[in-house]
């Protein structure tokens, strides 16, 4: 995303005009200048998620505690006349390790299941972090680097099979639609493009307040958003979804209008803002991983002081830094209904 700046008011006309022309020319000039100067500051909210032309190779420094997509396989090409069942899959985050612990807090992970009628094979498709959630939410402060170092990538994972117990025991496994093999193949091409261009994970949804219709400053980009994008694409391709309730976890931050600060070079580079750079690193320091119990408790107090008492939060979005003037209630986890999409009636027979 381009950095906002004031437009160059290079006026081509001559302001040294005769007395009778001066008033209206001055008025037009001032109006033009006001429009030009004010235009870039009126940002688009929410800030659009930046897409890329390719997915970069991860830095070797970034290591996953749990291997990403260990049994992944290419998405198969289905026969056009196959009938594919589409399943909504949802389970508590880290259910494989903690069971239903996070399910009580409605912190859920979402995925999509498919079953081919012709072959009887099942498949799972999900989108999640390459290096776990903490690395996608907060950076590493490496002594040899001036700028915070981010291990933040998310990607799609497709593999054969659906672990029924994993999804059913504490979550959801329910049929939501039936599509043709042709529609599945079209979806697969879209998934490939989506995965190559949407490369990083975003934990937070940032809004002005919890009230309905409040301004949204930034949207999250996570597992549930991938599922919602895929459902929307299937509906565009003609899929008809069942009328069932579907809820999703969202983690909100609440703030006044964000202030754009700059990117890594403009803040942490040789000619960067040293005061701002230090403030950002101080903010992120309590979030560092591998803490002892004593360090962890101290960090909680430091985070409380920064976010609640001083009402400050530094957000990294689109590889750029923003300042959030935090507002009550500061942070909230919700489990909201987002309806399944309606079929595109202009595309029949798909």
Curated annotation (Swiss-Prot):
It catalyses: S-hexadecanoyl-L-cysteinyl-[protein] + H2O = L-cysteinyl-[protein] + hexadecanoate + H(+). The active site is at residues 109, 223. The keyword Transit peptide does not apply. Residues 43-350 are lumenal. Residues 296-335 are annotated as: Membrane-anchoring. Belongs to the CLN5 family. This is Bis(monoacylglycero)phosphate synthase CLN5. It comes from Canis lupus familiaris. The lineage of its organism: Eukaryota, Metazoa, Chordata, Craniata, Vertebrata. The gene is CLN5.
């Amino acid at each position: 995303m381009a950095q906002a700046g004031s437009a160059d008011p290079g006026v081509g006309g001559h302001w040294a005009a005769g007395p009778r022309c001066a008033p209206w020319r001055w008025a037009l000039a001032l109006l033009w200048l006001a429009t030009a100067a004010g235009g870039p500051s009126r940002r688009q909210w929410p800030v659009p998620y930046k897409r890329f032309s390719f997915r970069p190779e991860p830095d070797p420094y970034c290591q996953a505690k749990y291997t990403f997509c260990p049994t992944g396989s290419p998405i198969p090409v289905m026969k056009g006349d196959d009938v594919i069942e589409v399943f909504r899959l949802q389970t508590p985050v880290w259910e494989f390790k903690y069971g239903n612990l996070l399910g009580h807090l409605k912190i859920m992970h979402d995925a999509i299941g498919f079953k081919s009628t012709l072959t009887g094979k099942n498949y799972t498709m999900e989108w999640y972090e390459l290096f776990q959630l903490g690395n996608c939410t907060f950076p590493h402060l490496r002594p040899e680097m001036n700028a915070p170092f981010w291990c933040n990538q998310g990607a799609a994972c497709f593999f054969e099979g659906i672990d029924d117990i994993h999804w059913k025991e504490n979550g959801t496994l329910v049929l939501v639609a039936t599509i043709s093999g042709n529609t599945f193949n079209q979806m697969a091409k879209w998934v490939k493009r989506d995965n190559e261009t949407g490369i990083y994970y975003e934990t937070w949804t940032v809004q002005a307040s919890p009230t309905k219709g409040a301004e949204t400053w930034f949207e999250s980009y996570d597992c549930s958003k991938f599922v919602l994008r895929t459902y929307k694409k299937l509906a565009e391709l003609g899929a008809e979804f069942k009328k069932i309730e579907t809820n999703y976890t969202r983690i909100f931050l609440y703030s006044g209008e964000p202030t754009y600060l700059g990117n890594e070079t403009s803040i942490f580079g040789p000619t960067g803002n040293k005061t701002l750079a230090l403030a950002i690193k101080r903010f992120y320091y309590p979030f560092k991983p591998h803490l002892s119990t004593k360090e962890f408790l101290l960090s909680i107090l430091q985070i409380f002081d920064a976010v609640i008492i001083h009402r400050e939060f530094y957000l990294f979005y689109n590889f750029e830094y923003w300042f959030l003037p935090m507002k009550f209630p500061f942070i909230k986890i919700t489990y909201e209904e987002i309806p399944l999409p309606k079929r595109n009636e202009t595309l029949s027979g798909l």
